[in-house]
């Protein structure tokens, strides 16, 4: 048997709860795998065989102690703007689709998703399935493939997760359960109230009332916790809080920012601020231009807002600047698009590196990589090798400039301007620590990275086990 985790809304903590359950089951010797039929996210991961899936499912696979694979997230939607998304099907880019046309093909997609779930079950036994958004989107019941349609096909016991932090938890839970179709409502076996703040004893009556009005056991009141695992979507950027740290790094919060999880390890060591285009960049110790799902349109926003000139000014002042993936492409002199990434045309980049990027075909590079650092400059000399992954359309032709890593990327003569396609550069703690050390050295500061002596997935599992009656969930896996 397996379990399905649905939510009363987006950002209630489904992904984190699934990751915690995957680790709890693993610690009890129960083989399991995560599964999410359809995910909409610009944060993605590359599997060992070059497939692309949502980063949440990769994170959950790590919690379960198994390698991520494309069956864990067979349908990934990557928004490009103008109500258009790229469909990534079983890890490969399939086609772009307008929102009003997507639901015309969901029957076929549900079949693909169920086949993927079946393969995972035959391989690992149990599944911990994650729904998408809110479960009670009644206007989508007839075509939904992530919540109701999937629940109807799988018939797994359902755990409903609610977010008390945003308020209205009674309406969230009661309303969601009441609105579920008659054949789905009996599958709801447990409710978990997430993101609680304060003394749990003060909500004991609330848990009792939830059980009385829904007839469903309320098995957990889980306090807010700061566990160091990747975020899934851009809503989490709203929750990030700036902390006091020896250095301050600006990450340009592009309208279509992707893979912002690249910088979450840096947040352990530095004050990382996600600043929107138009925000003054003076005073930062480093600037990062991140990835984007639409390089051209976000580049136009960077230029129109004045941020492009701010970045150029920072370059003349010797501020370290790093462009990753789409940010790397923006640093180029010129971008040629045949209508693949955005509209057709030739566009001027920021002109900080002598390179040209070309989008000429509907082909995407998705690959895990390990590369040797060139060792050129005060940052790259601190690291020997790096591991990460590439996810990008287009190719960049390097001009008269040094290579940053073996076979990829660029670095300026002074070593302060770096462009690379490598996502995950800073998710390696030794690279993130080396970058912060480099920035501290420039300020004459002595800094030592703090030790992390416990697996964050074990920390998460311990936290959930302390506040959820796990013994009421375990029978679902017999």
UniProtKB/Swiss-Prot annotation:
Domain GATase cobBQ-type as annotated: residue spans: 246-431
Gene Ontology terms describing biological process: cobalamin biosynthetic process
GO molecular function: ABC-type vitamin B12 transporter activity; catalytic activity
Catalytic residues identified in the record: 325, 423
Presence of keyword Zinc-finger: no
Residue intervals passing through the bilayer: none
Key words of the record: Cobalamin biosynthesis, Glutamine amidotransferase
InterPro entries associated with the record: Class_I_gatase-like, CobQ/CobB/MinD/ParA_Nub-bd_dom, CobQ_GATase1, CobQ_N, CobQ_synth, GATase_3, P-loop_NTPase
SUPFAM superfamilies, A to Z: Class I glutamine amidotransferase-like, P-loop containing nucleoside triphosphate hydrolases
Tagged with keyword Disulfide bond: no
Pathway, per record: Cofactor biosynthesis; adenosylcobalamin biosynthesis
Function recorded in the entry: Catalyzes amidations at positions B, D, E, and G on adenosylcobyrinic A,C-diamide. NH(2) groups are provided by glutamine, and one molecule of ATP is hydrogenolyzed for each amidation.
Family, similarity comment: Belongs to the CobB/CobQ family. CobQ subfamily.
Name of the featured protein: Probable cobyric acid synthase
Source lineage: Archaea, Methanobacteriati, Methanobacteriota, Stenosarchaea group, Methanomicrobia
């Amino acid at each position: 048997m397996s379990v399905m985790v649905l939510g009363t809304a987006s950002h209630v903590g489904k992904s984190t709860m699934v990751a915690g359950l995957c680790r709890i089951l693993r610690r009890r010797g129960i083989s399991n795998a995560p599964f999410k039929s359809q995910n909409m996210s610009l944060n993605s991961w590359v599997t060992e065989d070059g497939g692309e899936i949502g980063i949440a499912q990769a994170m959950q696979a790590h919690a379960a102690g198994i390698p991520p694979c494309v069956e864990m997230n067979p349908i990934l939607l990557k928004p490009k703007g103008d109500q258009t998304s790229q469909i990534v099907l079983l890890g490969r880019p399939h086609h772009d689709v307008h929102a009003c046309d997507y639901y015309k093909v969901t029957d076929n997609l549900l079949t693909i998703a169920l086949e993927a779930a079946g393969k995972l079950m035959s391989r690992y036994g149990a599944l911990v399935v994650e729904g998408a958004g809110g479960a009670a989107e009644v206007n989508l019941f007839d075509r939904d493939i992530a919540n109701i349609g999937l629940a109807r096909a799988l018939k797994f016991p359902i755990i409903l997760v609610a977010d008390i932090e945003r308020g209205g938890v009674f309406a969230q839970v009661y309303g969601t359960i009441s609105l579920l179709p008659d054949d789905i409502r009996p599958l709801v076996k447990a409710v978990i109230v997430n993101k609680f703040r304060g003394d749990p004893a003060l909500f004991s009556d609330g848990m009792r009332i939830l059980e009385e009005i829904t007839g469903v056991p309320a098995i957990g009141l889980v306090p807010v916790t700061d566990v160091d695992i990747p975020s899934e979507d851009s809503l989490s950027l709203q929750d990030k809080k700036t902390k006091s740290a020896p250095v301050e790094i600006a990450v340009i919060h592009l309208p279509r920012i992707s893979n912002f999880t690249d910088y979450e390890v840096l947040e352990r060591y530095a004050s990382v601020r996600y600043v929107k285009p138009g925000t003054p960049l003076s005073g930062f110790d480093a600037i990062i231009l991140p990835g984007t799902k639409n390089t051209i349109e976000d580049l136009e926003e960077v230029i129109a807002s004045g941020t492009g000139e701010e970045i150029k000014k920072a370059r003349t002042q010797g501020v370290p600047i790093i462009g990753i993936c789409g940010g790397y492409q923006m640093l180029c002199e010129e971008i040629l698009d045949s209508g693949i990434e955005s509209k057709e045309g030739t566009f001027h980049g920021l002109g900080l590196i002598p390179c040209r990027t070309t989008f000429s075909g509907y082909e995407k590079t998705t690959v895990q990589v390990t590369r040797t650092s060139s060792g050129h400059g005060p940052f790259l000399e601190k690291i020997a090798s790096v591991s990460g992954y590439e996810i990008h359309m287009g190719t960049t032709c390097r001009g008269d400039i040094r290579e940053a890593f073996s076979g990829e990327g660029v670095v300026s003569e002074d070593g302060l301007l770096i462009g690379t396609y490598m996502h995950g550069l800073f998710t390696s703690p030794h690279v993130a620590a080396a970058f912060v050390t480099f920035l501290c050295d420039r300020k004459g500061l002595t800094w030592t990275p703090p030790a992390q002596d416990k697996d964050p997935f074990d920390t998460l599992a311990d936290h959930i086990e302390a506040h959820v009656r796990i013994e009421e969930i375990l029978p679902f896996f017999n």
